[in-house]
Amino acid sequence: MAIKVLVVDDSSFFRRRVSEIINAESRLEVIDVAVNGKEAVEKAKRLKPDVITMDIEMPVMDGISAVREIMASVPTPILMFSSLTHDGAKATLDALDAGALDFLPKKFEDIARNRDEAVSLLQQRVIQIASKRAFMRRPVASSTPVQERPQSTLNRPTTGLRREAPAQAPVSRAPVAAKFRASGKKYQLTAIGTSTGGPVALQKILTKLPANYPHPIVLIQHMPATFTAAFASRLNSLCKIQVKEAEDGDVLQAGVAYLAPGGKQMMIDGRPGAARLRIIDGGERMNYKPCVDVTFGSAAKIYADKVLSMVLTGMGADGREGARMLKSAGATIWAQDEDSCVVYGMPQAVAKAGLSTEDLPLERIAERMLVEVGLA
């Protein structure tokens, strides 16, 4: 049976092209369209589609308000279309906070010209999030900025510096009521890589960390260049730790999370205790900018076994080769479990390669981190 899709957009051209692209995939079927958020809510309740594609800026009711109403009444996987502007980024993050599962840049030229990459990406995203209808959740609870958070001064100098693994021991899966035990390892860096579903996952984790988190955190989230500054700002307003978009030459400091800028590669240079970030363009042939493998690989060279790393929800296999390098250096690698992932791609690639030691539900990752670093 085909996946039923409701297409929502106030542009007749965009509705028609998105519908044509979706219907070109035999596993998908557009069952109706809506021209504004109010109509989308009504049709979502009546038709109960498997997936909804949603514009943000629409008359009568905007996309964010529609997402909130749909999630409150008939939770459905929603894929947002967003403009590549700072305001568009903020609105998209609001939509994800309200319950949307994923987003795609709204590129009229690519859609109009039927470019293979844009067509395939849209079809794949719809199919991927359709599998998560049972996963649907209420909006993220924490949306109130932390008050009177002490601010530290960040040191920002202007310059700075395959083969499949054999089968490993079974991955440890924590029962719901299990109490975690620290491994006893000492860490100097936490590294987290993610893609689809990552903004919500990172918010859930980072908002639970205290301001005295004992070492730096590097974050690699697949995201367009115009989105990462807005995402870092949002996280910074919600978290006790500091969160910033990484800049070339940043000196890594404890209690600060550095988000890799979209469209760039983030590497670590120097030595433990005096490490700096290098932000570079990277090769055009790289599939992802930023790329989890790139940052993880550089972390392995600098910090070796002193890295606590995690691969969270996301499509594809980015992070697997970086995790392989971390594993060879003796670092700790965790993967998000399948049930709590929006897309079980990246964590699955790491787990199947025998690289992760623990398979954790999203809701307990922060708790596990605090135990592991000696704060719980």
Curated annotation (Swiss-Prot):
Residues 4-121 form the Response regulatory domain. It is an enzyme of class 3 (hydrolase). NCBIfam families: PRK00742.1. GO terms for molecular function: phosphorelay response regulator activity; protein-glutamate methylesterase activity; protein-glutamine glutaminase activity. Residues 183-376 form the CheB-type methylesterase domain. It is found in: Cytoplasm. Gene3D superfamilies: 3.40.50.2300, Methylesterase CheB, C-terminal domain (3.40.50.180). Its main location: cytoplasm. The modification 4-aspartylphosphate is found at residue 55. Belongs to the CheB family. Keywords: Chemotaxis, Cytoplasm, Hydrolase, Phosphoprotein. It comes from the Bacteria. GO terms for biological process: chemotaxis. It catalyses: [protein]-L-glutamate 5-O-methyl ester + H2O = L-glutamyl-[protein] + methanol + H(+); L-glutaminyl-[protein] + H2O = L-glutamyl-[protein] + NH4(+). Phosphorylated by CheA. Phosphorylation of the N-terminal regulatory domain activates the methylesterase activity. GO terms for cellular component: cytoplasm. Its EC number is 3.1.1.61, 3.5.1.44. It holds the Pfam family CheB_methylest. Disulfide bonds: none annotated. Involved in chemotaxis. Part of a chemotaxis signal transduction system that modulates chemotaxis in response to various stimuli. Catalyzes the demethylation of specific methylglutamate residues introduced into the chemoreceptors (methyl-accepting chemotaxis proteins or MCP) by CheR. Also mediates the irreversible deamidation of specific glutamine residues to glutamic acid. Residues 138-174 are annotated as: Disordered. This is Protein-glutamate methylesterase/protein-glutamine glutaminase 1. The gene is cheB1. Residues 141-158 have a biased composition (Polar residues). Contains a C-terminal catalytic domain, and an N-terminal region which modulates catalytic activity. The active site is at residues 195, 222, 318.
